[in-house]
């Protein structure tokens, strides 16, 4: 299986650089994983596709303003992108500058804050905040929303709201769980009123989600690691849902990866899970938990299009993407969505 198998040509004008005026105003392409049948819908039509008793699982991570700008002691400019918060004072981060800062050197951030370069681990740096404030307080004060590289514009005030789900709760992500961006409070209320059950897991999406796959053979790819939490109450709800013959619908690839990570950690029998996961899902993977998923359109050759292909069949997914391009769907984080049902193995 070659990475290039997952390639497609995307016209630049189909990359969504801004969100729709209303969250749920996006289009929705439905894909039946068993038959490959496609249908063009609106996102609000999803209400008619989720049944009473089905369980929808959302990722409630909160995107932190993870991009910082500052200067080295020499005066050279640098940019810091937080990969994860280690504690209240320390971060693991990518640092972009003409020359890498030295260990033990001081970095002067915008706003007058200072950080010490504590250690280096290959491409990542450990930085320590020299302040009475917490990392989160400094990020909220001077950090910028970490828009993906393909959005290709500076972040704006509106992104602080729109590059964030309405149900976000646990700060720590440096990229949004984008399938969730389409839901507003009214739609969540309508789902609950219909008898759909709602549950939340947490996966702090890392910057690694944008890293290209740099090997030719898919099997040689080393997945980045992210922190996930699947609490016991969600495990219990999933068991009840399955026992009643209803579906588990994951909102986004991060929810899929959280649930499947928990199943993998307990060898197929779902138990509560909290810790790092580097689960890499590609065609051939047997899904343990998830029956249907909502997801945006992903980058060519990305691990995310591989995951969707594993779920609904490679040929079906690549055909769906060609259809989406022909029909001018909007792609990537601020783009349109798919509702995909699982292909039976």
UniProtKB/Swiss-Prot annotation:
Main enzyme class: transferase
Cytoplasm listed as a keyword: yes
Gene3D superfamilies linked: QueA-like
UniProt key word Disulfide bond: no
A GO CC term assigned to this protein in UniProt: cytoplasm
Enzyme Commission number, as recorded: 2.4.99.17
Protein's pathway: tRNA modification; tRNA-queuosine biosynthesis
Keywords, alphabetical: Cytoplasm, Queuosine biosynthesis, S-adenosyl-L-methionine, Transferase
A Pfam family the protein falls into: Queuosine_synth
Compartment list: Cytoplasm
Catalytic activity: 7-aminomethyl-7-carbaguanosine(34) in tRNA + S-adenosyl-L-methionine = epoxyqueuosine(34) in tRNA + adenine + L-methionine + 2 H(+)
GO biological process terms on file: queuosine biosynthetic process; tRNA wobble guanine modification
Biological role: Transfers and isomerizes the ribose moiety from AdoMet to the 7-aminomethyl group of 7-deazaguanine (preQ1-tRNA) to give epoxyqueuosine (oQ-tRNA).
Subunit relationships: Monomer.
Protein family: Belongs to the QueA family.
Protein name: S-adenosylmethionine:tRNA ribosyltransferase-isomerase
Originating species: Shewanella sp. (strain ANA-3)
């Amino acid at each position: 299986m070659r990475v290039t198998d997952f390639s497609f040509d995307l016209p630049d004008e189909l990359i969504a650089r801004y969100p729709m005026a209303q969250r749920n105003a996006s289009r929705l392409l439905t894909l039946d994983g068993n038959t490959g049948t496609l249908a063009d819908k609106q996102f609000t039509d999803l209400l008619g596709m989720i049944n009473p008793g089905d369980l929808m699982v959302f990722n409630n991570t909160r995107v932190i303003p993870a991009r910082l700008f500052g200067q080295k002691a020499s005066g050279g400019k640098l940019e810091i992108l937080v990969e994860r918060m280690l504690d209240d004072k320390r971060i693991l981060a990518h640092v972009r500058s003409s020359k890498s800062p030295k260990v033990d050197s001081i970095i002067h951030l915008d706003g007058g804050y200072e950080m010490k370069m504590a250690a280096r681990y290959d491409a990542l740096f450990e930085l320590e905040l020299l302040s009475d404030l917490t990392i989160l307080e400094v990020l909220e004060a001077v950090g910028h929303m970490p828009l993906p590289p393909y959005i290709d514009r500076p972040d704006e005030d509106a992104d602080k709201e729109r590059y964030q789900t309405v149900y976000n709760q646990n700060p720590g992500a440096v990229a949004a769980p984008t399938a969730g961006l389409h839901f507003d409070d009214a739609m969540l209320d309508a789902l609950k009123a219909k008898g759909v059950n709602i549950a939340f897991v947490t996966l702090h999406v890392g910057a690694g989600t944008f890293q290209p796959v740099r090997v030719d053979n898919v099997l040689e790819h080393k997945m980045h690691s992210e922190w996930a939490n699947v609490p016991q109450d969600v495990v219990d709800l999933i068991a009840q849902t399955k026992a009643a013959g209803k579906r588990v619908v994951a909102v986004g690839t991060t929810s899929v990866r959280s649930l499947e990570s928990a199943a993998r950690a307990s060898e197929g029998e779902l138990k509560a899970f909290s810790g790092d996961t580097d689960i890499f899902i590609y065609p051939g993977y047997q899904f343990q938990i998830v029956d249907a998923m909502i997801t945006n359109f992903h980058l060519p050759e990305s691990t995310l299009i591989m995951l969707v292909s594993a779920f609904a069949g490679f040929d079906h997914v690549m055909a769906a993407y060609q259809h989406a391009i022909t029909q001018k769907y909007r792609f990537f984080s601020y783009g349109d969505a798919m509702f995909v049902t699982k292909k039976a193995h």
